Amino acid sequence: MAARSGSRPDESPPPLARADGVTKRYRRGSEPGRVARALGRSSPPKVTALEDVSIDIAQEEIVGLAGPSGSGKSTLLHLLAGLELPSEGTVTFQGTDLNTLSTRKRTRLRLEHVGIVFQHFHLLDSLSARGNVALPLVELGVPKKERRKRATELLERVGLEDRVTHRPGELSGGEQQRVAIARALVTDPTLVVADEPTGELDTETGTRVLEQFERVAEDRAVVLASHDQPTLEIADRVVRLRDGRIDEEATVRAPSRTDT
């Protein structure tokens, strides 16, 4: 790919998100994901979920996080998404050190620029699929007409155009997961983080959800944490964690979706 005018051929754009020497400690019992369960009863009052981890997330790159339960995958996702701050080290997003932001500004940045899909996602039974997808836009103060339009468009993109007015109880597990994916993308985020996005789905449904996820995640940076090999196979790069440290890193396929 030809270098852009005014830039050197070996110059690469700055990372969208960066964790630099991050360590995260928790009081026992407050760890995210499966870290607490994996540590067991003999763990000390404070546990180290991540230790001296550094990783760059490029724009328009899919990064897979692999590793056993308790390896730190969920914790790293939380830090990259700005849901938590590191005990040591820095996490930057678009060049801004998240440690320097107030809780209010960090929440606003996350709502505007980060889409989050968790394995145990929560949909409100009192709202339709469209209402659930539009929730982040409500938080951002987007007018109702625009909320409905954008939520409907996202549901169409994940193949749920005939489920727009259905409530969660009227949807299958795979359909509910696609609603959660649409909700994560409705603000047009530049970064999407997903923790075991197909963890509770059967193989066939999981495959369909992954296909939809890969399609709608184009032109965004995506970080996926999973034990599931098919999920990791959609990544450009897989980073394996063990005991809170990066154990291995490998390129899985072409470096960038924009180069093909």
Positions of the model-derived regions?
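Short coil-to-helix segment of the ABC ATPase nucleotide-binding domain corresponding to the Q-loop/switch region
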Residues: L124-L135
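Conserved catalytic motifs of ABC-family nucleotide-binding domains
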Residues: D188
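Catalytic Walker B motif of ABC-type/P-loop ATPase nucleotide-binding domains
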Residues: V192-D195
